[in-house]
Amino acid sequence: MIGKTRHAVPLAPATFAQGCGVLRHSPPPGAYRHTRYAPAGALADWVQHFWVESWDLRGAAPQIRDVLPHPCVHLAFVRGRTRIYGVHLGHFVRELKGAECVFGVKFRPGVFYPFLGKPVGSIANVSFPAQQLFSNITAVEEELLSSPDVHRMVEVASRFLLAHLPPRDPIVEQACGAVETIAKDPSVTRVDSLLALCGMRERTLQRMFRRYVGASPRWVIKRYRLYEALEQLDHGKPANLAALAQNLGYYDQAHFINDFKKLIGRSPAQYVKA
C-alpha cells in the first residue's frame, strides 16, 4: 500500500515495493535495491524499520526518484555524511547517480522528541549532521558501513540505538497512537473526528503533534487519505474523482486535486495517464 509501510521481516529482506514511498510512475530504477528489516525487542517501540538502499549507476544516466513524504524522522548512514532528516512536508525528488549504499533508521511517528530534546516540528524539511545529536556517531558510522553484511549492520545500529534510548515519555505513546489511528481508520478525515477518538482538546492535540510528530494533525490526516487515493487510482478505481474526493473528506473536487498536485507533483488525471 502506498504511504503505509509493510511489515518488515527480522533480518530477511523485504522486496522493494511501492510501499517504500516511491511513486509507481518514477523512471525505471536500474541497478537499484531497497530492503527493510524489522527491529527486535525494545527497539520495536522506537523504530519502524531499518532500511538499506543501494544502487550502481556508474556509466549510466542518473535516475530521478519521486518520493512521498511520511510523518517520520530518519537517521541515514552514509560514509562521511551521516545525517538526521526531519519530516518532509511536501513532494520531493531525489537524484541517484554513481554507486552508493545507504543504511537508514526510520523512527516511528511521534517518538523522536525525547531524542531531539526540542519540538520535532523545528526540524521539518531540514537535515543536519547526526554528530550534532550523537557525539560518537563517526565511530558507529565506520563500524556499520564496514560491516560484511546487512545482518551485522543491523546489529551495530541496534546496539547503538539501545545505548542511546531516552527515558520513557508517556506522551510518546499518545502521539504514536494518534498517528496510528489516522493511518488505520479511513473515516478520520478531519481534525474534529481525531479529537473525538483521542479525547483531547484541539490546542493540546496541535501542540502534541508539533512537538512529537513534526507536522500538524491536519497535514498527517491529509497525507494518509491521499495515500489511499493513490492506492485506489493505482487499482483503477474509482473513475469518479468527485466521489473519491468526497469519500476522503473533501468538500469539493477542486481542493482534492490541489492537495493531490502538491503531494504528487501532478493532477490525478495526469497521474493515471502517465
Regions found by a protein language model. Name each.
Residues 1-192, 197-202, 215-216, 231-235, ...:
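Alpha-helical bundle regulatory/interaction domains
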Residues 205, 212, 229:
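DNA major-groove recognition helices of helix-turn-helix
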Residues 209, 221, 259-261, 272:
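DNA major-groove recognition helix of helix-turn-helix
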Residues 212-215, 259-267:
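A secondary-structure capping/hinge motif
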